[in-house]
Amino acid sequence: MRFAPSPTGMFHVGGARSALQNWIFAKQQGGVFVLRVEDTDAARNKPEWTEGILAALEWIGIARGSYEGPYFQSSYATEHRAAASRLHEGGRAYYCDCTREVVQARTGSPHTGYDGFCRDRNLGPGAGRALRFRTPDEGATVVVDLIRGEPTFDNRLIEDFVIARSDGSPVFLLANVVDDMTMGITHVIRAEEHLPNTPKQQLLWDALGVKPPVWAHVPVVVNEKRQKLSKRRDKVALEAYRDEGYLADAMCNYLMLLGWAPSGDREIVPWPVIEEEFRLEEVNPSSAFFDEKKLRAFNGEYIRALPIAEFIAGCQPWLTGTATIAPPPWQPDEFDAEAFAAVAPLAQTRIAVLSEIVPNVDFLFLDSPLIDEGAWAKAMKEGAGDLLDAVIAAFTALPSWDADSTKSTLEAVGAEHGLKLGKAQAPVRVAVTGRRVGLPLFESLEVLGRERTLTRLRAARLRLP
């Protein structure tokens, strides 16, 4: 098995799914997983994209050292050129000097494929001359596909396609085939967008006298509008999800469900079960919807299932400011690990991604809360000042400070003002945390402490008439 990404941008979630499918299939078959970086597009390749591929694979559990590679397609240039020469010398390819504009003028249509004009001109290599494969004039090419059966392609409808540029460098079709042959690849799992290339590549395998691999074209991943996921339009970079605080286990679980389902009525499935149950033959050939809302829900489930120590450890990059997004509004020396540990079980049940921990606990580590003015306007209605006066007095007089005491006290004060507990909580919550929603209020007050709570209530009271 091989996974062959191109280092031309951020690592795509669709690529991550293909990598996982190849990884599992290789383990199931007792085979070898090969990482081959297809780096022949010199104008677009960047070393940081290659490093990003390696880091992304490591994040989803495909660690360096557990596979062969990375190999680089550019290092096989000699083999590519040798294969092109072999095809030319064997009469299976010919040189052509037709430009796209000339072909269009000759055929009268920009959509018509190459017309075979140079097939019998016996041109040799030279400037402006590409090498084209001589497609058979009859018959059909049958692709054996574990997911799609045996798609059949009429050879007469396959144009004589370019396999090498005028400078001798191979195009993707030839380089890909030669690399797979060189590496002894027996199965190719890739996205269905490559299916139109497959009969051409299979013809190349046949022409080079080597048995082609077994193919498996997995369904394309689409957005909610059923459009193929686009780097320009959609959130597709695996790194972006990692940096936002998605868990690798949740991401892997979700990606494997794009086109496949485990046994039973379940979706949250342990990875060992996925590795055991996954079957390429069971993959649905229809397009797979990448539902970010569902992924968030998955991630929330995985977060809630973490042991509390792992949850606390997982939040550390955002709490300490070492994460790449969502920097905390407090200074490193203001962070109180003990206070966070006290509220961590409460926060764990309320966030869907780890980066959401910051706005849920920032009130604990700041001298004054960050007031959401919209929340303030909704909570501080007429009578809020009188309510806060009474709450301040009652909280000051409490003999002990804990969640039960503050709750019963606020409930009593609210009743005196004709308010149920939910209504009475709103101005207190905004005054203390800056927000209308968040962690359970009374447990938060206990951790915050009496003096800091009263200081914030008094500051809020000063803003009111």
From Swiss-Prot:
NCBIfam families in the record:
gltX_bact
How this chain assembles, per its entry, is: Monomer.
Against Pfam families, the record matches this protein to: Anticodon_2, tRNA-synt_1c
'KMSKS' region (motif): residue ranges = 228-232
TM spans (from-to): none
Q: Does the keyword Aminoacyl-tRNA synthetase apply?
A: yes
Motif, 'HIGH' region: chain positions: 5-15
Binding of ATP occurs at: 231
The main place the protein resides is cytoplasm
Q: Per the record's keyword annotation, is Transferase included, yes or no?
A: no
EC top class named in words: ligase
Cofactor binding remark: Binds 1 zinc ion per subunit.
The name this protein goes by in its record: Glutamate--tRNA ligase
Its encoding gene is what? Answer: gltX
Its function, per the record, reads: Catalyzes the attachment of glutamate to tRNA(Glu) in a two-step reaction: glutamate is first activated by ATP to form Glu-AMP and then transferred to the acceptor end of tRNA(Glu).
What Gene Ontology molecular function terms does this protein carry?
A: ATP binding; glutamate-tRNA ligase activity; tRNA binding; zinc ion binding
Which species is this UniProt entry from?
Salinispora tropica (strain ATCC BAA-916 / DSM 44818 / JCM 13857 / NBRC 105044 / CNB-440)
Q: What is its EC number?
A: 6.1.1.17
Q: Please, one GO biological process term?
A: glutamyl-tRNA aminoacylation
